[in-house]
Amino acid sequence: MKEIKRVFNFYDQTYLKSYNLDKSIRYQLNLLDSLDIYTRKHCESVATITCNLCRKLHLSKGFTEYCTICAYLHDIGKLFIPSSILQKPAKLTPEEYEIMKKHTTLGYKLCIKDSKLRPYYAGAYYHHEALDGTGYPQGLLKKAIPYEAQIIRVADEYDALVNKRQYKTHIGITDALKIIIENTKPSVNAPEHTGYSKAGKNNKKIVKKLLSVVIDDIEYEISCTIDYVNDLEKDINRLKKIKTYIDKKNSSKKKKDIVYYGQYIDLLLLPGESEDDFSNIYQEAQNAYKLRKNILDGLYNEIKSIKKLKI
């Protein structure tokens, strides 16, 4: 299985320097520290997905760097949204939703006023625009929406679906992708005069690449899980040997045999383990192995389901 760099780590100086971002993004990193933990993590995830989408789309390194920073700043306007709305545990009322939508224009104004943020205003301003004209804040059409915003929109929608917000129910990866794919199809709510009756909200080409990015992420998770399962298998084999020696020790009647098997048991036990709590240790290892095997099966099935999706 190919090696995959899964996460764009904004706090790893080595990784930042490889993209020449260590100086340009340090200011933005400090600025977003003021956001609540969910929004900050969401911005990081959207930036990571955006970076990977740009790679899949074979965009230039310069544009990828620019687009990644735009994505990281896309929700910067939420600095000005009341926490009572931003962190509300229940679904927003229509009035609250209208206030929440203002984060796009608020983010735009913040970026325009700040010379260090100004180059990246497009992420904040346009990431909720839709190709069919049903987005906000301006209701722009396909050709008027910057390409970076089209990419960020898809990344933002995916992360918002798979990572549970306070007022939303978590859904699975495949179901999230189905929703995003559905949003590539024409909407009944699209303005009739737009001339884009065949366009959906999302760019099909970008959504196709999203499927590839998600599969890469799952394959990375599989590779990590396989390593852990292999370690568990080795440990269970060790524990099986201990169990065999314990059984033989318990069935032995001669003192020398009891001592002999006891010595082998002591050699196989790890620091912190003892023969007295062996049953619990053995059971916990078996349970962990079964759990990880089930996770692996689920991940493999997830990839199969994603590959069956059609755009």
Residue ranges: model-predicted function:
Residues K2-K310:
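Histidine- and acidic-residue-rich, metal-dependent catalytic cores
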